[in-house]
From Swiss-Prot:
EC number annotated for this UniProt entry: 2.1.1.182
Residues that hold S-adenosyl-L-methionine according to the record: 18, 20, 45, 66, 91, 113
Biological role: Specifically dimethylates two adjacent adenosines (A1518 and A1519) in the loop of a conserved hairpin near the 3'-end of 16S rRNA in the 30S particle. May play a critical role in biogenesis of 30S subunits.
Catalytic activity: adenosine(1518)/adenosine(1519) in 16S rRNA + 4 S-adenosyl-L-methionine = N(6)-dimethyladenosine(1518)/N(6)-dimethyladenosine(1519) in 16S rRNA + 4 S-adenosyl-L-homocysteine + 4 H(+)
Catalytic class of the enzyme: transferase
The protein, known as: Ribosomal RNA small subunit methyltransferase A
Family in the record: Belongs to the class I-like SAM-binding methyltransferase superfamily. rRNA adenine N(6)-methyltransferase family. RsmA subfamily.
Entries under PROSITE patterns matching the protein: RRNA_A_DIMETH (PS01131), SAM_RNA_A_N6_MT (PS51689)
Keywords: Cytoplasm, Methyltransferase, RNA-binding, rRNA processing, S-adenosyl-L-methionine, Transferase
Primary localization class, coarse: cytoplasm
Pfam families, A to Z: RrnaAD (PF00398)
Amino acid sequence: MNTRVHQGHLARKRFGQNFLNDQFVIESIVSAINPQKGQAMVEIGPGLAALTEPVGERLDEMTVIELDRDLAARLKTHPFLGPKLTIYQQDAMTMNFAELSEKLGQPLRVFGNLPYNISTPLMFHLFSYTDAIADMHFMLQKEVVNRLVAGPNSKAYGRLSVMAQYYCQIIPVLEVPPTAFTPAPKVESAVVRLVPHAVMPHPVKELRVLSRITTEAFNQRRKTIRNSLGNTFTVDVLTELGIDPAMRAENISVEQYCKLANYISDNAPPKES
């Protein structure tokens, strides 16, 4: 028996396809999302409609983004979903979510069982549109969820933790075993809720600076900050900002990374006219 075939569709490895088929898990996810009529619900990677059907039952219309043309075609001809769906057959990484929000006239509620091979870059793409997003619910590799929620002084804490927590409040919802999917992935999964901050707790002046600092620090996470960020900050500056130069990347809080980023923005040499 070919375990990569589900409902007549061959799961494609290059799209990272694993189809959810556990009814209890599906109902738990839909209950956590709690979709309401009139909301701008957007599903990324609907696949064989395991979540699309129960969510669609509660709505008059919804938007889906599906890269696989065969699956997009199946959705278009779905007996009850078809007329309710606006289908974008494209890569979600190329989607302008701000334009979509403007078109739908309200912030988006985004959800999906994300392909694990693109989940991290896709979340970074979505973070750049948090002004247009009300909330997000995603099925992810459990290890990625652990990184999203991790705090300082833990192995899981990294650049993804800092950037995700800069943009959003992050709430784990439930854990999902491999047996809930066809084909069964080799990893544990989990559902997470991300709610963009209405007011940024630690606003930075230039996001690209925060992104650069966290990349530099975590690329050399075993080094002390005095060494990994030594080209940017002197020991005196670190001390002045309340950051021990002997700390490593994983010891520094989101708030402290934001302080470092703002220091660079405030002290950058003026641009030549």
